[in-house]
Amino acid sequence: MRIRKNGAEMLARAGRSSLLASVAAAALSIAPAAQAVVPNDNLSPEDIVDGTDVNGVGIMYRDDGFVCTGTLINPRTVIFAAHCVNDLSTPDYSTVNGGVPVAFAFQSDARPGLIDWISNGYRTNTALSVYNVNNIAYHPDSLDPPALSFLYGDVAMATLDTPAADVPTWTMLFSALPAPAAINETTGTGYHVTVTGYGRTGSGTTGNSVGIDFRRKTAENFLGMLGSLDDIDS
């Protein structure tokens, strides 16, 4: 029998851990662990807390104290980074048989919902926009040693046990992006994006310095590169 800590203790442990952040940019962009939402020095991490409560970008919480950001693409499917879950095999994620329970919460401040999920036996609570996961699949290429778990094939999907009927979904873009308005040293590729997620943050001076507080942050930037690993000199 596994003995579970209470919700507050579990969240405190997660906040102290070295947690990974993935972000949604435009429809979705999955980021490596080193990425964080870092505003310039005119704004603080408090200033960039997302003012929209439920917008389809949610936080994934594993009962073993690991969190990531994911994006709802239909009422029962969330897309997120494989490195958030590929340390275990997919059958190991379960609310029964001693598995690791997983849920997604979609409120801007996800702490109350996650505490409720842990304290009440890992149950979906639609009133708090918290949905239990009943199936996970991740790309096998994310396990390739040269990939370091995220350099390529870093994509996973989770199925929710209850449709998130009242949560907005995001459309995935598979066609080419339209040409940007301008490309220069300031705009990089010229593609202006909105970046949002629950990961670490900081300021322009301190960089990635503030831990996860279970609140969704939002910022704007320009993409510095839009390409593949083959475009980067090793």
Label every model-predicted segment.
Residues G65-V67, V78-I79, C84-N86, P163-D166, ...:
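Solvent-exposed loop/turn segments at secondary-structure junctions
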Residues K217-S234:
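Extracellular trypsin-like serine protease catalytic domains
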Residues R2-G7, L11, A21-V78, D87-V100:
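Protease-domain processing segments flanking chymotrypsin-fold serine proteases, especially trypsin-like
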Residues G58, G70, R76, F80, ...:
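Terminal peptide-recognition signature
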